Amino acid sequence: DGKILNENHMNQKTVRKGEMVYPNVVEPSFGLDRILYCLLESSWNVEDEREWISLPQDTSPYDLLVAPLMTKDGLDDSAKEIFAKAQEQGIDAYYDEAGSIGRRYARADEIGIFFSMTVDHQTLEDGTVTLRERDSKDQSRVSVEDALSKVRR
């Protein structure tokens, strides 16, 4: 109603408390690259002069290496037929004929291929191949069909 307020009508008080408040920001960040790096780092093995990635079979880049012992005497043709048969059966196979068989095994081990199949002269005679398992380096002589069946499991 027309009253005027002056300084006597007002009261100003400054209050300070001893509690400090720090703002928090949580930004969890991870991507596939970090997960993949951890997977590869934990799977890397070194034994004497041999180095390999010990990935589980279902995460390895290829299921099978098909390698002829040499590229003559029809071994490469037989290996290419087996390679095609493996692909027809849904096996993710890799064909390699460069260098010695030991070097091919080493390359396959380094990229994590679980099984390696060697086609040699005995393959031409009786239809068997040498199947090698990556981690144990165990080798067995089996028929092509049994080898492909074992790889598919």
Regions found by a protein language model. Give the residues of each.
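NTP/phosphate- and nucleic-acid-binding module
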Residues: 1-153
